[in-house]
């Protein structure tokens, strides 16, 4: 059992090291995109399923409340947080539309959609991205594996942050770390620390 624990930690560390080498440019571009959207008076919508839903909610909470330091609230909304809306849409046998309908209702040109999917093939996330494109939103996609269908929907103005792994658990771990990096970059760009 102790060896298995060490394997889990080692795999996680190796995935983080690979991500640290491969992803800084994409993470930086995503943060700049989000900052520009916020400075223009827009908002960030985010969505995911399962563990990715938790990551989306964490991002929105960090924007609205704070990340590591006190600052004004920033407009972000997790589309998977409203169970009434999600179950209302699902009860009409439109599960694939649970995020797309919300994007069409709430998304405005200049907003950002943070779409999180470990394999990039979740139908409801794909449809949310398609809806965001029709609303002239930009997209930040957190993916893994080969990026799936989601990667093929992105335009040159969008950013894919693809975790270099083929294990969902490792991908989700680095998605959370990536969200923390985005929050840190957004905060430090909009509200630079005096002691930096």
From Swiss-Prot:
CDD domains: SIS_GmhA (cd05006). One of its GO terms (molecular function) is carbohydrate derivative binding. Residues 34-196 form the SIS domain. Keywords: DNA replication. InterPro entries: DiaA, GmhA/DiaA, SIS_dom, SIS_dom_sf, SIS_GmhA/DiaA_subfam. One of its GO terms (biological process) is carbohydrate derivative metabolic process. Disulfide bonds: none annotated. It holds the Pfam family SIS_2. The keyword Cell inner membrane does not apply. Required for the timely initiation of chromosomal replication via direct interactions with the DnaA initiator protein. Belongs to the SIS family. DiaA subfamily. PANTHER family: DNAA INITIATOR-ASSOCIATING PROTEIN DIAA (PTHR30390:SF6), SEDOHEPTULOSE 7-PHOSPHATE ISOMERASE / DNAA INITIATOR-ASSOCIATING FACTOR FOR REPLICATION INITIATION (PTHR30390). Homotetramer; dimer of dimers. This is DnaA initiator-associating protein DiaA. It comes from Photorhabdus laumondii subsp. laumondii (strain DSM 15139 / CIP 105565 / TT01) (Photorhabdus luminescens subsp. laumondii). The lineage of its organism: Bacteria, Pseudomonadati, Pseudomonadota, Gammaproteobacteria, Enterobacterales.
């Amino acid at each position: 059992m102790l060896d298995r624990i060490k394997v889990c930690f080692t795999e996680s560390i190796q995935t983080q090291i690979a991500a640290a080498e491969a992803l800084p440019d994409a993470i930086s571009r995503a943060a700049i995109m989000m900052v520009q959207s916020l400075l223009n008076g827009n908002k960030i919508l985010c969505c995911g399923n399962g563990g990715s839903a938790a990551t989306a909610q964490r991002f929105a909470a960090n924007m609205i409340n704070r990340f590591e330091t006190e600052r004004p609230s920033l407009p972000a909304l997790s589309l998977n947080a409203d169970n009434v809306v999600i179950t209302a849409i699902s009860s009409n046998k439109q599960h694939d539309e649970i995020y797309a309908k919300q994007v069409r209702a709430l998304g405005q040109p200049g907003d950002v959609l943070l779409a999180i999917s470990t394999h990039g093939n979740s139908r409801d996330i794909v449809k949310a991205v398609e809806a965001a494109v029709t609303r002239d939103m930009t997209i930040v996609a957190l993916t893994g594996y080969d990026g799936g269908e989601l990667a093929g929907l992105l335009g040159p103005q969008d950013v894919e942050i693809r975790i270099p792994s083929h294990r969902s658990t490792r991908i989700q771990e680095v998605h959370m770390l990536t969200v923390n990096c985005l929050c840190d970059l957004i905060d430090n760009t909009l509200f630079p620390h005096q002691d930096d």
